[in-house]
A protein has these predicted regions:
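Single conserved hydrophobic/aromatic residue that forms the stacking wall/gate
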Residues: 1-11
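Carbohydrate-interacting/catalytic domains
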Residues: 5, 35-41, 51-56, 60-181
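Proline-centered turn/helix-capping motifs that create local helix->coil transitions or kinks
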Residues: 13-14, 103
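Active-site clefts of carbohydrate-active enzymes
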Residues: 14-35
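Conserved glycine-rich, hydrophobic/aromatic-active-site segments
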Residues: 44
């Protein structure tokens, strides 16, 4: 609730072009902070789904770890070559979805469902609506809400989504549902 209210205020006052990140060269890397590594892809889904321009600090797309208290060398690793993995693939899909979505780039923000382990929020522009859905639990979750339409397409996977009977989110999952017109 505070995030929605605070974000809404900043969003209206400052515009839609602020930079967002989950870690950088001055803080402990997010992969070192999270106690459950299944949450790592989800935090990036949140970053790419929220208003703003997501910035991925180099190495973080591979799940690089590093702690601020261990000094700069821990945070600013050098790499001989890319360490492409499933997280890299996931972030690439999120970036592609964001790149091609008017709502994710310029749309407003509205919270739809919020629990301790799940959130669904709407990004709406003049021509597009996208629901960003995240389940951070180790259990499946079925969300019941009025989507305002019957079907959508997941911008991450390309799969169709039917809102009839509730929307099931598998454990540790995220979706960007582009709503039908």
């Amino acid at each position: 609730c505070l995030l929605s209210r605070g974000l809404g205020d900043v969003y209206k006052r400052q515009g839609k072009h602020f930079l967002s990140f989950v870690d950088n060269h001055d803080v402990t890397r997010v992969a070192s902070i999270l106690t459950n590594k299944n949450h790592l892809p989800l935090i990036y889904a949140l970053a790419f789904g929220m208003p703003g321009i997501p910035c991925v600090y180099y190495g973080s797309e591979w799940g690089a770890e590093g702690r601020k208290e261990e000094g700069d060398p821990s945070l600013r690793l050098s790499y001989e070559k890319p360490e492409w993995n499933e997280l890299t693939d996931w972030i690439s899909k999120l970036a592609e979805a964001k790149k091609h979505s008017e709502a994710l780039n310029y749309g407003g923000f509205r919270s739809v469902v919020l629990t301790n382990h799940q959130c669904i929020f709407e990004r709406r522009s003049e021509h597009e609506r996208v629901l960003v859905a995240i389940n951070a639990s180790d259990q499946p979750y079925t969300a019941h809400f009025d989507a305002g339409c019957g079907t959508a397409q997941d911008l991450i996977t390309g799969q169709p989504h039917d809102f009839g009977g509730g929307s099931e989110l598998p454990p540790y999952s995220a979706a960007f549902w582009k709503m039908e017109h």
